Regions:
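Membrane-proximal, glycine/serine-rich, low-complexity loop/turn segments characteristic
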Residues: 1-107, 121-156, 185
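A generic short-segment signal for beta-strand/edge and adjacent turn/coil regions
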Residues: 57-61, 114-117, 179
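Solvent-exposed, glycine/polar-rich loop segments of beta-barrel outer-membrane systems
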Residues: 107-118, 167-169
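Outer-membrane beta-barrel transmembrane domain signature of Gram-negative proteins
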Residues: 124-129, 164-185
Length: 185
């Protein structure tokens, strides 16, 4: 089947394709979902009043003059099942998520007391995380059974953020982790 959703006034959507097939004791299913957006020119105005120790008020105004926001996400899952209703169950599932938010930015006009200048913020983010899950069950006798399960996961994240309102501030993250969990009962 399919489920498609798109906005008419903005670049925004969420679309899904899925299916399932059965044959004998086996079943194969999949799903794929993609969603994303792109907005340009969103603006906000901010005014902050600070009361100083001498009782005077100090005002800073931040007004957006230019901006771009965009992001896309993909999620996919593939599952295989085999089942003998009297004794055995096997299931293998592979799913993954990929997210990308490239080069978003905002440019602001700053009025800081008597000074006026521009400030820029930039951000980008990318991550993906595949997961493999395997399950097995076998009834050996009416009182004995074996169950086994294993899950393997990998996560990768890359993030970069930059802001300059007079003094630049930047940080980057590049993180990766993997795990394997299993049990037999």
């Amino acid at each position: 089947g399919m489920d498609l959703t798109s906005a008419l006034t903005t670049l925004q959507g969420d679309d899904m394709v899925y299916g399932k097939w059965n044959k004998g004791k086996s079943e194969l299913s999949f799903s794929y979902d993609v969603s994303g957006y792109k907005t340009k020119g969103e603006k906000s105005k901010q005014s902050a009043d600070y009361t100083l120790t001498d009782g005077s008020i100090y005002t800073i105004e931040r007004n957006d003059v230019e901006s771009l926001r965009k992001s896309i996400s993909h999620d996919a899952k593939l599952t295989y099942n085999w089942s003998d209703s009297t004794a055995t169950v096997f299931q293998a599932s592979l799913n993954g998520a990929f997210n990308n938010t490239p080069d978003n930015y905002t440019v602001k006009d700053i009025v800081d007391g008597t000074r006026q200048y521009k400030a820029t913020s930039r951000a980008k983010d990318k991550s993906y995380s595949p997961v493999l899950d395997i399950y097995f069950f076998r009834q050996l006798t009416p009182c004995q059974s074996v169950t086994a399960n294993a899950v393997a996961t990998y996560i990768s994240t890359q993030t970069s953020s930059y802001y300059d309102e007079g003094t630049p501030y930047k940080y980057d993250v590049d993180g990766k982790t993997a795990s394997l969990l299993s049990e037999v009962i």
